[in-house]
């Protein structure tokens, strides 16, 4: 497990400390990630959470561990308030788009998986949909009810948080703090403000597409139930890591813990480590899908940005730090990633990596990278190490190619296969591909070399008409970029 040098240290939200990570079974990690609610496309704020979880998984594998990764798909149960009021988000989307909730879920799930691929996020070993586990959830809820943890009101079956002495420990709020929180909703008949729905009963005359029979009446599971049920189903009663966004801490993960500990009733922590990724902001405000805002991965592509440029942008900030999104920031990230790819792609062309042995300098770079990653996934420092290696003239091409492969095991930013030209995606509406632009730029460079400046100017004008800006450099080389 420690074959690569440093011990991996991670921040545990439950303890608020960075500590050495040790899975319950040495060398093997059970990891559960809260997946998307598939009522709309996931915006880039959502995708930051999944890039973080992917970086964590890659780091665990980089350290020699075997990871069993499970992710849910919420296709029922998530209300518009995130708590216990409002309509189911899938039902709202179905009315909005005049389609069935099942069609909505299927289409947006497919879109989400496409975006995972675009960002080189490794898919989980197990996908699990809430609607495929309804009976499991009913059985789980019945067990809680039988043990005296729940009470029934017209709105459904509710968990009595006052019976849990450690309720709110993850959020450091407790019952009083939860009652004061903005996201705690009032439902008629609830005994306490922190009580939450385990099963929601459909109201008389309510016309829902997604509802099932249960001992408490026809209805649907509460949002928090699916993650407890499916994580235990696929990872066992106790597992190592649970990930999500910081917005999951005060309600969703707090309630998952309460019902899971009550169900297990064995005095052991349900999950060993809780890790949460921070928000990315747009002009100072959290990017939010529920408020109708947000930029999609497809929007990045339409603007001519390779999705891995966005991944690179995210890795420039620590996962526990908020960061800002802007098109200027994307442009800067593209420049930074292009610089790395320029060096690694050139080395790749001339290298015989199969014969490479790392010398002292290369070994030091790899050790520094390992140290950065082992310090709670310190990707900003890790990227600085990558940049230092790219600038190190003492490294041979083969060494650099081997290092690129090791670095990219964790970073996933295309160091082993992308070229600078690959970053220049044609924006939406472009009349030519990046390859066609590259051919014109090469032709223009030849004209400049031959001092055929008339032809050079004609080609520059042609490129401008195609939405391309050409930059000529002092060393005689040229580069290009889309104008939008």
Regions found by a protein language model. Give the residues of each.
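Anion (oxyanion) recognition and catalysis
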Residues: 61, 145, 464
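Structural preference for alpha-helix termini/caps and helix-kink/transition segments
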Residues: 2-4, 286-289, 293-484
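N-terminal, positively charged nucleic-acid-binding surface of large information/translation enzymes
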Residues: 15, 24-120, 140, 475, ...
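Short, well-structured beta-strand/strand-turn elements
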Residues: 66-68, 148-154, 393, 469-471
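The substrate-binding groove and active-site-proximal loops of carbohydrate-active enzymes
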Residues: 92-100, 125-131, 217, 245-246
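Alpha-helical recognition segments enriched in aromatics with Gly/Pro capping
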Residues: 1-39, 54, 114, 134-348
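Short Gly/Ser/Thr- and Asp/Glu-enriched loop/turn motifs at secondary-structure junctions
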Residues: 123, 153-154, 473-477
């Amino acid at each position: 497990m420690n074959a690569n040098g440093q011990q991996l240290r991670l921040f545990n939200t439950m303890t608020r400390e960075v500590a050495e990570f040790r899975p319950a079974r040495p060398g093997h990690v059970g990891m559960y990630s809260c997946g998307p609610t598939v009522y709309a496309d996931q915006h880039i704020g959502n995708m930051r959470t999944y890039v973080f979880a992917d970086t964590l998984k890659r780091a665990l594998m980089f350290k020699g561990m075997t990871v069993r990764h499970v992710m849910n798909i919420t296709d029922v149960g998530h209300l518009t308030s995130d708590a216990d009021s409002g309509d189911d988000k899938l039902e709202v989307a179905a009315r909005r788009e005049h389609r069935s909730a099942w069609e909505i879920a299927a289409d947006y799930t497919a879109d989400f998986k496409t975006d995972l691929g675009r960002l080189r996020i490794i898919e989980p070993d197990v996908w699990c949909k809430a609607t495929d586990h309804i009976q499991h959830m009913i059985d789980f809820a019945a067990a809680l009810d039988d043990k005296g943890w729940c009470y029934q009101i017209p709105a459904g079956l509710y968990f009595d948080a006052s019976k849990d002495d450690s309720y709110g420990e993850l959020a450091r709020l407790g019952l009083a703090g939860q009652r004061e929180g903005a996201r705690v909703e009032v439902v008629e008949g609830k005994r306490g403000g922190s009580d939450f729905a385990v099963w929601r009963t459909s109201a008389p005359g309510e016309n829902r597409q997604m509802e099932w029979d249960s001992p408490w009446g026809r209805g649907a599971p509460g949002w928090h139930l699916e993650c407890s049920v499916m994580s235990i189903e696929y990872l066992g009663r106790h597992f190592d890591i649970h990930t999500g966004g910081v917005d999951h801490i005060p309600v969703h993960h707090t309630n998952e813990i309460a019902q899971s500990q009550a169900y297990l009733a064995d005095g052991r922590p349900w999950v060993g480590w809780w890790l949460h990724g921070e928000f990315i902001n747009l002009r100072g405000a959290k990017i939010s899908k529920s408020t109708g805002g947000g930029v999609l991965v497809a929007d990045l592509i339409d603007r001519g940005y390779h999705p891995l440029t966005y991944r690179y942008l995210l890795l420039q900030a620590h996962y526990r730090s908020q960061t800002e999104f802007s098109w200027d920031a994307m442009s800067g990230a593209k420049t930074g990633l292009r610089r790395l790819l320029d060096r690694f792609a050139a080395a790749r062309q001339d290298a015989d990596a199969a014969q490479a042995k790392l010398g002292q300098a290369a070994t030091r770079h790899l050790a520094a990278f390992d140290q950065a990653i082992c310090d709670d996934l310190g990707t900003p420092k890790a990227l600085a190490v990558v940049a230092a290696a790219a600038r190190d003239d003492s490294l041979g091409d083969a060494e650099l190619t081997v290092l690129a492969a090791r670095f990219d095991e964790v970073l996933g930013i295309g160091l082993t296969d992308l070229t600078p030209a690959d970053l220049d995606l044609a924006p939406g509406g472009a009349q030519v591909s990046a390859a066609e632009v590259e051919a014109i730029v090469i032709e223009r460079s030849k004209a400049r070399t031959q001092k055929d400046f008339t032809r050079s100017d004609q080609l520059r004008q042609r490129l401008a008409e195609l939405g391309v800006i050409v930059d000529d450099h002092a060393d005689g080389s040229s580069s290009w970029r889309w104008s939008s």
